[in-house]
Design a protein with these regions (language model features):
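Bacterial N-terminal signal peptides
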Residues: 1-6
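Short, glycine/charged-enriched secondary-structure capping and boundary segments
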Residues: 30-33, 77-80, 102-106, 130-133, ...
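Active-site metal-binding motif and surrounding structural segment of the metallo-beta-lactamase
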Residues: 54-117
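Active-site environment of divalent metal-dependent phosphoester hydrolases
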Residues: 24, 94-100, 125, 168
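A short, active-site helix/loop in glycosyltransferases that binds the activated sugar's phosphate group
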Residues: 121-131
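Structured loop/turn residues at beta-strand edges in well-structured enzyme cores
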Residues: 83, 96, 139, 156-158
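Core dinuclear metal-dependent hydrolase active-site scaffold
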Residues: 8-77, 143-193
Length: 193
């Protein structure tokens, strides 16, 4: 499902909703509830929660969370919207939010220096735990340290503001993002307690 907010045919940045489900997608593995059974039987699925920001003028895009559905979400963002992925913002270290980074490594895409925006605990987690640390050491990803409530400029009149949110923080802090444009803004908070 792709939902576009703002003008699809204009020059203004817009949001692409790439997924709405929890960490394991829908249907979840092993789920025997009616909602899952209906999805299994129909062949339909919901991708894990993620959004993309597209700047049609520069043909650049940014991904918010690298989910287990990264291959199809990357394709939607780059091919369907004719952009180059120039950055990934991670929210936290639970399986549905960062495991897609593996596709950037040498076994799949072999990318070089993809900017990945993270707060300090998430940065340390990725640097000190394999296989993520290999992505760092081989320079597939370039970790960009961000701070609570400090704006990051990603385009002309386009900013991202990270902010801490309460959640289970076993391995990293949990971050929400406010994406601020010239006329509109939105918040991306895939998990919160």
């Amino acid at each position: 499902m792709t939902l576009l907010i703002s003008s699809l045919f204009g020059d203004r940045p817009y949001v692409v909703v790439l997924g709405i489900a929890q960490d394991g997608g829908a249907p979840h593995a092993g789920c025997e509830k009616r909602c899952c059974i209906e999805l299994w039987e129909s062949g339909k699925e919901e991708k894990v929660s993620s959004i993309g920001i597209v700047n049609p003028l520069t043909k650049q895009s940014w991904l918010f969370d690298a989910t287990p559905d990264f291959p199809s979400q990357y394709r939607i963002l780059t091919e369907n919207h004719n952009t180059e992925l120039v950055g990934i913002f991670l929210t936290h270290a639970h399986m549905g939010h960062y495991t897609g980074l593996l596709h950037l490594g040498r076994e799949v895409m072999g990318k070089k220096n993809v900017p990945v925006y993270v707060m300090s605990r998430m940065k340390r987690f990725l640097e000190t735990n394999g296989p993520w640390s290999q992505l760092v050491s081989m320079k597939n990803i370039n970790l960009k340290l961000i701070e609570n409530n400090k704006y990051i400029k990603i385009g002309e009149q386009l900013f991202v503001e990270p902010f801490l949110v309460p959640h289970r923080d076993e391995y990293s802090e949990t971050v929400g993002y406010r994406i601020i444009g010239n006329e509109k803004s939105l918040a991306f908070i895939p998990d919160i307690d």
